[in-house]
Amino acid sequence: MGKEPRDGGADVEAVYARGQSGNYPDPYLTPQDLRDLLDRCQGGDKLICNIEAYEIDGEFDIPRIDLGLYAGGVSELVRRWDERLAETTDFIESLLDAVAEEQNPIMFIVWLDKRASA
């Protein structure tokens, strides 16, 4: 049997460069991958704007909307970049703390937003 997305192991640099994690059969991001991607976004020209979280329970990948981030609307786009980055960073750090308390593994798919050229 081949490797499944739930096995993790996303290439964080490729995710950053592409602006999103892949779709099936690309691997999900693990919590550590998400932390590494967040670190990569600091000082860069992208930020994480959307996160889909999945609880891995046996053979099922259960969507966890309560652990997701859904941003990127017009109201987001008019805010200063540093404000958006700080808010996203705070959210993801809190999210990772919550995920650490979960019984089953939590994995992620993400989308990034690129800073508009000045």
Ranges and model annotations:
Residues 76-80:
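Intrinsically disordered, low-complexity coil/linker segments enriched for acidic/polar
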Residues 24-72:
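Amphipathic alpha-helical interaction modules
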Residues 1-31, 40:
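Long, contiguous N-terminal structural blocks used for assembly/anchoring
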Residues 10-13, 65-69, 84:
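Amphipathic alpha-helical segments in structured regions that serve as interaction surfaces
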Residues 81-118:
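Amphipathic alpha-helical binding modules
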Residues 1, 48-51, 55, 108-110, ...:
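Generic preference for hydrophobic/aromatic residues in regular secondary structure cores
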Residues 11, 33-36, 87, 91:
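Exposed alpha-helical structural elements
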